[in-house]
């Protein structure tokens, strides 16, 4: 089921078998090293996204502009995910991950995405806060956080990375001008 966010921007669930080659190409590029899949073969990437698809607390979507995929957007429930053990979790938290696809993005894409994705997450009345936790070494991601309305939280040592937590509160969120 495709979720229309505006006239040109939409989310559609990842279909591991048919989207596997696309995702494999994205997550095995050096710029995606923080996703930890640089050396994964195609079949393992498909298995990972099949697992995500089967879990009620996880979801993966392709962010599409004019029906073309330009980014990967994932959501998770920190109450179930191991991430929830590393920060002061609250009821109504939803974690998100975002990986931009390669290439020059179309005009208007980034602004629409950063306006509509948090708005879509907050369309669930139970969501009170969006949790982001990129690798602290991912300067591009960390520097973007305040520009999209996120408040930087603590850096936390985790088994696979040092996470820079950031939070977008429902009560204080307005669509950013990116």
What are these regions (language model features)?
Residues 1-5, 13-20, 28, 67-178:
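Acyl-donor (CoA/ACP) binding surface of acyl/acetyltransferases
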Residues 5-7, 56-57:
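Short, basic and Ser/Thr-rich N-terminal targeting/leader segments
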Residues 20-24, 46:
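Short amphipathic alpha-helical segments
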Residues 25-39:
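Helix-loop element at the rim of GNAT/NAT acetyltransferase active sites that forms part
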């Amino acid at each position: 089921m495709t979720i229309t966010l505006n006239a040109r921007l939409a989310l559609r669930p990842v279909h591991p078998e048919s989207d596997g080659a696309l995702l494999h190409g994205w997550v095995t590029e050096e710029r995606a090293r923080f996703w930890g899949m640089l050396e994964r073969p195609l079949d393992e990437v498909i298995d990972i996204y099949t697992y995500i698809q089967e879990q009620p607390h996880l979801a993966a979507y392709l962010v599409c502009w004019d029906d073309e995929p330009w980014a990967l957007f994932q959501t998770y429930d920190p109450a179930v995910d191991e991430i929830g053990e590393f920060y002061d979790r609250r009821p109504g938290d939803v974690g998100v991950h975002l990986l931009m696809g390669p290439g020059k993005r179309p005009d208007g894409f980034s602004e629409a995405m950063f306006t509509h994705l948090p708005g879509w997450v907050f369309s669930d009345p139970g969501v009170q806060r969006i949790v982001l936790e990129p690798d602290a070494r991912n300067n591009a991601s960390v520097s973007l956080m305040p520009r999209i309305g996120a408040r930087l939280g603590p850096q936390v040592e985790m088994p696979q990375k040092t996470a820079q937590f950031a939070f977008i509160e429902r009560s204080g969120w307005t669509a950013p001008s990116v």
